[in-house]
Amino acid sequence: MILYFTGTGNSRYTAQELNRFCGDELVSMNREMRKRRQDPYNARYAYTSERPFVIVCPTYCWNLPKVVEEFLLNSRFLDSRDMYFVLTCGSGTGQAGKRAAQVCETLGLNFRGLASVRMPENYISLFRAPEPDEAVAIIRSSMPLVESIAMQISSGRDISDSFAGREVPSFVVRLFYRLFVHDRRFYVKDNCIGCAACASLCPTVNIRMRGGKPEWQGHCTQCQSCIGVCPVDAIEFGGRTRKKRRYYLFADGRQKFPNEKRETEEDEEKR
């Protein structure tokens, strides 16, 4: 079973490519997270698979996203006792492998390794997204590695991370979360069309529409989905994102361009 968490589509696309080679069940953690917040009594908390569990997600501050860690620690994994991690990143994964091993130990699972896949930069609250042609080149250059990872998992071998880089001190991670992982600086401009694409995709159900405009509720994970999916680029994060190109990767591998109508995740999966 491949469970993926995605903000702007990089990890979803990677999970889909892994699935193309592995032929396994594909589960959206985004959808599962929304269900847990909206209807906790009827949400799914147990996952059963005879094949290894494969967790695909972005790298947040050289570590596992806290929202993914919390999801895993509040889930039950049945039958298979093996878990792999595949993280998308712009550079290195730091101590993500160490933390993933700790999560597996807590869950009573066998940590079978972590591998990273370089994908286009999407964290425009700090950096700049690549131009479309450059993004395509980055994605294409990473797909042979994704196939190799899939083959290793299918054959039952451990995987390893060739892009881990140095471990980042824990105080740096804490400082990063305190300074950047919040929604206090998000705002919407006058060109917002009230389509609610941002609210429908938010994995933490952190956006509510009021008067046809999005309002953030204080439990943002900075996945960048809202700022990336907006069809008219109406969402900003303070002054850091002004005039920056947005990045969003559709399920079929296309990039979003300004003024392109945005489908919901459910719409995409029906195609």
Sequence positions of predicted segments:
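A short, compositionally biased domain-edge/stem linker segment
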Residues: D39-Y41
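FMN-binding flavodoxin-like domain, especially the glycine-rich phosphate-binding loop
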Residues: I2, T6-Y13, E17-M33, A43-C57, ...
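A mid-sequence, solvent-exposed acidic-amphipathic segment
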Residues: G165-C195, S200-P203
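A short, structure-level motif marking secondary-structure boundaries and short turns
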Residues: Y84-V86, D183-R184, G211-G212
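Iron-sulfur cluster-binding cysteine motifs and their immediate structural context
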Residues: Y187-V188, A197-T221, S225-R242
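Membrane/wall-proximal cationic-aromatic binding patches
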Residues: R36
